[in-house]
Structure formats: C-alpha cells, structure tokens
C-alpha cells in the first residue's frame, strides 16, 4: 500500500524534473567511501559537525558543504549565526527540532521550526542571520550548500520558507516513511521541483525514516552524484557486489555505477539521501563566497565591503 501526504504547491510555473525514468530491475549502487565529519564551531560559537567538507566538493559536485548541528545544551547554539554574507550558491536549512529565525537583506523573514525547510538562493549577494528562538531544549538540523551554475551565480536573491506540513510524505510500505524535500520519490514530487533548464542540478533531497527493520529502494539518475548521511540508528547499502554497513553519523559516498540505491535500515534509523547533476565548472571559494574564478571572488569581497549586498 502506498500512502501519500499531499503538499500545497510552493513553486508555481515550473516544469517537472526532466529525470530519466529508471527501468526495473534496479541496479543498486555500492559504497565508494565512508566519511566521518569534522567537529567545529561556526557563527557565534555554534557547535556542529561538518560532514561534507571542501575535500569532497569536486567528487560530490554540485554539493559544497553539509553541516549537522544538534545539542540540547543552549551553550552550544545560543549565539546562533548573526549577520553574514553569501554569494554564488544556495543554502538549504532543514530543521529536525527547534526554532530558528531567518532575516536577510532582501527583506525576507521566516521562522524555521520542527520539520521545516528554508531554501535560500544567495545569487548576486545577500546578508542574512539565523538566530535561535529558544533558550533551552534540543536544537538539531542540517544545512546544505548547493552550488549554482555560472549563469545563475549573479541572479536575484530568492527565499522559500517551507513549513513542515508543506513537505510531501510518502510511505512506500508501512515500515518506511519518506519526506520528499526536493526531487521525486515513489511517484511523489517534493516541495521543491524546478525547471532543469534554469537549475540543472536537479537536486534530490530525501529524509528516510525506518519504523521497523526494513528496506527502501530509490531510483537515481545514473549521471548524478549521490551520498547519504545516517543521523539515527544504522543502515546498510546493498548492491550486487556487496553489503556495506553505515553506522551512526557517517556519510557514505555512492559509486556512480547504478541507477538506484537499496538501503536496509535498523528499527528507528533515519537517513538523508541527496543527489544531483554535477555542474563540472571550476569552484573558487573564499569563506561564504563561491564563484568560478579568483577574480570573481575578489569582486565579491569588494562588493560586500562596499555595501552592495544590502540592497
């Protein structure tokens, strides 16, 4: 039985994703590498784990970074992320638990709460803050940095505030729930689905919950880079070659050799599955600026110092 939770459309006049239809049988990808994140602090002392670092940017193009923050100690998150700039990419913040307010120089404001997503396109430049609206309790979530193609890096900044009840959920069977943040799973379109002619990365972003020990299959475009991150319990990735166990708080990079992935989850396991089309463009990064050349980075710094991100 397939149960689908309908979502209110949040992006109008976009084409459906031009994804390749995966034929059966599914050829599951195997695990190329497992990665343990780096503990660090960012913003005003927020404790987090940097799961996807610059080391893996080229391999996991178009994805630039994935941070996982999670603590019930206010000292670990109370300072939040005061005003800071971005140019040339998108940030996707997914809140598992807690309350955080977003404000930016384009005049956008939103409250990110349990299960919600904020999808911000920095484009030509934006200054924003992300500050906790709680003084105690658990705050947990993820922030993904998604690169923009060269022709979109100087686009107008944009912002989507997606509440939890606007994210479609599908149950491939009674033991597995999938929250479809972006892309498509089990014939269910995600909260974000955009024209590939404008946004060629064709991002897939799933949050998969295993209620019992069970399996889940997801079609993947054979041309796309893909990885998963286990944030509860443990899972195994099953392919014709091998079965690989992925423990808690590990990222698994999937080989580009199949048209899907088969995941077996332990009871209560939760995993993010993310994939996208590589841009195959030069990556030049200086902190919160991601462009294609050093000259463009220098211009970004000059523009920020000149106050041009404020408009």
For each of these PLM feature ranges, what is it?
Residues 2-311:
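Jelly-roll (double-stranded beta-helix
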